[in-house]
Amino acid sequence: MSIDIETARRVAHLARIRVDEADLPALAGELSGILTFMEQLNEVDVEGVEPMTSVTPMRLKRRQDVVTDGDMQDKVLANAPDAREGFFAVPKVVE
């Protein structure tokens, strides 16, 4: 499929990008190349081929969805200038 300059201008307008008139022939050529490649992909026989999301058959490691405190409260509060009763203590902001 061949894209003419007027179609390239319209695509640029729809995409909300500014393209100089001098650059429209190059844009038309690039769009034509993309569409030619897509036409080649449409010719590939994919009958019986399962869709895939990755080239490697990997699964994510799963863990139990359990709420914990992280067992790091003491380490985290050690960085605080003032901590009381297991919480950060901050100066009063609103009277």
UniProtKB/Swiss-Prot annotation:
Alphabetized Pfam families for the sequence: GatC (PF02686)
GO molecular function, one term: asparaginyl-tRNA synthase (glutamine-hydrolyzing) activity
Domain of life where this protein originates: Bacteria
Stored Gene3D superfamilies: Glu-tRNAGln amidotransferase C subunit, N-terminal domain
InterPro entries named in the record: Asp/Glu-ADT_sf_sub_c (IPR036113), GatC (IPR003837)
Keywords assigned: ATP-binding, Ligase, Nucleotide-binding, Protein biosynthesis
Catalytically driven reaction(s): L-glutamyl-tRNA(Gln) + L-glutamine + ATP + H2O = L-glutaminyl-tRNA(Gln) + L-glutamate + ADP + phosphate + H(+); L-aspartyl-tRNA(Asn) + L-glutamine + ATP + H2O = L-asparaginyl-tRNA(Asn) + L-glutamate + ADP + phosphate + 2 H(+)
EC code: 6.3.5.-
Any one biological process term the GO annotation gives: translation
Family to which this protein belongs: Belongs to the GatC family.
Subunit structure: Heterotrimer of A, B and C subunits.
Function: Allows the formation of correctly charged Asn-tRNA(Asn) or Gln-tRNA(Gln) through the transamidation of misacylated Asp-tRNA(Asn) or Glu-tRNA(Gln) in organisms which lack either or both of asparaginyl-tRNA or glutaminyl-tRNA synthetases. The reaction takes place in the presence of glutamine and ATP through an activated phospho-Asp-tRNA(Asn) or phospho-Glu-tRNA(Gln).
Alphabetized HAMAP family for the sequence: GatC (MF_00122)
Protein name (Swiss-Prot/TrEMBL): Aspartyl/glutamyl-tRNA(Asn/Gln) amidotransferase subunit C
Native species: Cereibacter sphaeroides (strain ATCC 17025 / ATH 2.4.3) (Rhodobacter sphaeroides)
